[in-house]
UniProtKB/Swiss-Prot annotation:
The name this protein goes by in its record: Segregation and condensation protein B
Native species: Lactobacillus delbrueckii subsp. bulgaricus (strain ATCC 11842 / DSM 20081 / BCRC 10696 / JCM 1002 / NBRC 13953 / NCIMB 11778 / NCTC 12712 / WDCM 00102 / Lb 14)
Subcellular locations according to the entry: Cytoplasm
Quaternary structure annotation from Swiss-Prot or TrEMBL: Homodimer. Homodimerization may be required to stabilize the binding of ScpA to the Smc head domains. Component of a cohesin-like complex composed of ScpA, ScpB and the Smc homodimer, in which ScpA and ScpB bind to the head domain of Smc. The presence of the three proteins is required for the association of the complex with DNA.
Matching InterPro entries: ScpB_csome_segregation, WH-like_DNA-bd_sf, WH_DNA-bd_sf
Keywords carried by this UniProt record: Cell cycle, Cell division, Chromosome partition, Cytoplasm
Domain of life of the native organism: Bacteria
Name of one Pfam family that matches: SMC_ScpB
SUPFAM superfamilies found in the cross-reference section: Winged helix' DNA-binding domain
Family membership: Belongs to the ScpB family.
Gene this chain is encoded by: scpB
Length: 200
């Protein structure tokens, strides 16, 4: 009979990029939440300790998924032939900060906060998988609403949006005298993540 870890790994594999929610695992594996969390932690440690394994287990918003590990990211990017070496612009960083803290938000609302047109930089974020359109606003023209993606959380090491540093009065205090914004200025660990964003 296969072990519970083997069963979990198989389910994660067939779930693919979409991942699998904790409640689904609870039903399929017939385990309580604490047991699932313990099992997931054991699998995480097993994958991390295996130098011949290029996978890792992530938990995002009570959903588990298998992804490629950071050690093989360059190879994976080369496989998909996606130009991720080009530095992301300061405008895109500002927009990403706004979307992260004000989502769901329309492009017009982003423009109003920044005072300039954001179309090009916003599309760059969509292309890079950090932001996506999700639904429309109940307003004239039904403009698209934008939110951050699971990849955004994954990239910066957050489990959910609740882990983002708290910024009071976002519209008024988060931009400096030059109109720039530091998305993760509140603490050291998050600040490191911001610099990682600049290197995208």
């Amino acid at each position: 009979m296969t072990s519970k870890i083997a069963q979990l790994q198989a389910l994660l594999y067939v779930a693919g990029d979409g991942g699998i929610k904790k409640e689904q695992l609870r039903d399929l594996l017939q385990l309580a939440d604490p047991e699932i969390e313990s099992l997931a932690k054991r699998l995480q440690e097993k994958l991390a300790s295996d130098l011949d394994c290029g996978l890792q287990l992530l938990e995002i918003n009570d959903e588990y998924k298998l992804t490629t590990s950071g050690e093989v990211s360059d190879l994976v990017e080369a496989y998909f032939n996606k130009d991720l070496t080009k530095n992301i612009s300061q405008s895109a960083l500002e927009i990403l900060a706004i979307v992260a803290y004000r989502q769901p938000i329309t492009r017009i609302e982003i423009d109003e906060i920044r005072g300039v047109n954001s179309s090009g930089a916003l599309q760059t974020l969509v292309w890079r998988g950090l932001v996506k359109a999700q639904g429309v606003k109940d307003a004239p023209g039904h403009p698209k609403l934008y939110v951050t993606t699971d990849y955004f959380l994954q990239y910066f090491g957050y489990k959910s949006l609740a882990d983002l540093p708290v910024i009071e009065n976002f519209e008024d205090s988060s931009f400096d005298a030059d109109g720039q914004v530091d998305l993760f200025a509140e603490n050291g660990t998050a600040d490191e993540a911001f610099h990682k964003m600049e290197d995208l």
